[in-house]
Amino acid sequence: TPPPANRAQLRPPIVDEMRPTTLDGYASKPSTIATFEAVFPNAYHIRSVLPIPSQEEIRDDGVTFCWCPFDQALREAGPLTKRVLHAMEPHLEGHKRFIYIDTKIQYFRAGDVPVDSQHWHVDGSIVARGPQVQALGHNLLHDMKARLQRPSLSPKLLAYQSSRHCATRFVTVPVSLTMPELIPNFDGLDQAVRTLDPPCEAQPASSIVSFDGLSLHRATAAEDDGWRLWVRCIETDREVHLTRPIINCYGTVFRTLPQ
């Protein structure tokens, strides 16, 4: 891990896709965060459905990736992941500077969760830290207004999940709601979406779906025991530098212990 003085030098410049333009406006404003009318288009589409792999194929695929460049992942992937990446290629838009691959091979017992939250959220949010954020009483803020008001800058994503027993849920219709311009976490957004209860869909087994940084989705608990391969492809202008905490959390299965 580089010393603190060098970490700032390693940080890539902020690209327009990730620029917290709303936060910039708070430099001379009171410390109360305003609300706005947020519209989530929820551009979720099923792009292809592949043959459902066997549990042995998933278990034995062997290699997982964390923010890995697409070309490298394609070279080094196991047989199943390689088939998925080849199937994703025709659906890449090719308008961003970087294409990254994340994958997980996880074994779930019924009730296990693939990530640390089942909140409704969006991927690739604009995250801000620093003195301006601290002046508003937080260590971190997601600039939701900046993302939603500049949809053309959003990252583009593809996702694959192999199995029936643990499927991501996606909202399938546009959703409008009033929310803070800047949020420290997705708790309030999750509550608002659950209250609205919009139509949503579980990603079909062994399907590839497309969505973007304005698409509400959430993890669900596994309904049964078994292996699952999950693959996410993100096209973004943001250059990612991995840190040990990011690597360590990937692939963790979250389980509620009996009381």
Language-model segments: residues:
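Non-heme Fe(II) oxygenase catalytic core, chiefly the N-lobe of the double-stranded beta-helix
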Residues: 13-205, 213-226, 233-245
